[in-house]
Amino acid sequence: MLIRIITFLLILNISSINLHAAQFIPPQVGDYLVAKISSDSNDYSTTKRYYQRLHRSNPNDLLALDRLLLLSILDGDLLSANNYSFKLAKAGCDKNVNSCCMNNQSPQGHLVNGISYLNSYKPGFADQSFASIWRGNLSDSTFVRLLRAWVWADSNTIDKSMALIDLISTGEHQHLTLVHKALIYDYADEIELAEVFYDQSLSVQRDLYVLRLYYNFLHRNNLTEKKDAFADEFLSSYDEEFQNKFLTSNKNRIIQNPLQGIGVVLFNSQLLIEDLNEELAHMLYQLAIDTSPNLHEIKYIFASFLNQLENHDKAREVLSYIPKKHYLGNFAAIQISDAYSYEGNNEKAIQNLNTFVEVDDSFEAYLSLGNYHRYEKNWSDAIDNYDHALKLGKKFDKENIWEVYFNIGIVHERSKNWKLAEKNLKRSLKLSEDQADVLNYLGYSYIDMDQNISEAKVMIEQAMELKPNDPYIVDSLAWYYFKVGKYNEALSLLEFSLDMMPYDPTVNDHYGDVLWKLGNELEARFYWQKAIDLDQENIFEDKVKIKLLKGI
């Protein structure tokens, strides 16, 4: 009877809740968990759908609104972000009062509101929104003042803009304050003042994106003398191919309105704001490319960041917006292929670069294309692309032409043509004698073939001086000691390499050899078997299997 009464009361209570609180359906824990898991895996669309479900269940859920605001930004949906931002500000407010509960608003909400107001030509509201970013994860006085300065970046209000920048402490982010003074004066057509501040900023630091903006300024304003001297003064360390692409431009402004100037501040925020987490850094990059679409350097840096987060699909999408003829175009194409490669899809990486070189004869693209063919053991195709790279490298006097000869040497060594391999490896060293990887590769090859042992040791020691504690080079030196019968010396070095690279098949194979020579036969067989298990390319499986049966 007691159980029946309790059951009846529970049913009555639940019915009452459903009748009187239809507007509130408690969110399920599972919704939060799925949203969290999707967010961690960069699946922002799925995450957004689950938070939208939570929001429908409880429109005043501040957590759901704040997450929807951020996720909309990450998804590149500024319109929705702005909508959620205003909902967040008004959540729980008295609808009869024409006000917002601004305490609900997050720093990213104020940021999005400011961008929206500026885009709607409401500078006063934009300034107020940016000025409200004084707390939370985006709190930085220089960041806020630069945002506000761009709100007033107009010939009629430029004094107000400069007054805000002048509030930034002397020496604190000096370079960026000079850059933004130059950009704002440039936008306001104060040519002489812009020129002064460009010169001052470049005397402190020479970032490529600032150089690009400065050259655009010189080109637009027909400052011929400085424009003609630009390459010698600022690009002398770059090769001719890079210079040609950099200097090929039209006279269109890169920063065409204050909102695009805000994009540069958002790009700079990574240097200004301390302890940014990955999500907020991602948000700021996304807002930067949305607000300043003409500054392609932001896209390139953002894509590198996305690849580090293993968000390769979005990285490729961002890179695809960089024009192929831009000075970063070939590097963007290579990074797109790298993103495919990170996913284990070298075939797509090759297809992408093949398409690119039809449009642009690029040394870097052909070199990268040769590398991908080498990874796939397409020896003939690798050599063909390296030959293209060599022609372009000689034409433009590329400093890293040694790298092409090095890779050609690797192809010939792997395809059992040692004479050509040795010739190209030596040619590489002749062009650049302090290349640790080339010294190590040639030295190790000599040792493995029992040739030029003393010369090989000198090469490996030189490599070790250039790259101390590199586990591959340490392994090569250990292999030298093994070959000359100094097994204890070899053992201590291999233990270091094994700690650094426990999953490298060559190191495990070498470690097994040394253990066998020192009488630890059972343990040696364990490491030989491990080498076979780790050898995905089956380079020396048969050789190691013989050792498992017979020893050495």
Segments (PLM) and residue ranges:
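Canonical tetratricopeptide repeat
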Residues: R67-L68, V112, L147, H180, ...
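N-terminal leader/linker segments that initiate helical-solenoid repeat arrays
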Residues: L19-Y84, C93-Q108, H173, Y238, ...
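Position-specific recognition of the canonical hydrophobic site in helix A of tetratricopeptide repeat
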Residues: S39, I73, L118, A153, ...
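Structural marker of alpha-solenoid helical repeat scaffolds
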Residues: S57, K90-D94, M102-N103, G136-N137, ...
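TPR alpha-solenoid repeat register
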Residues: A64, G109, V144, T177, ...
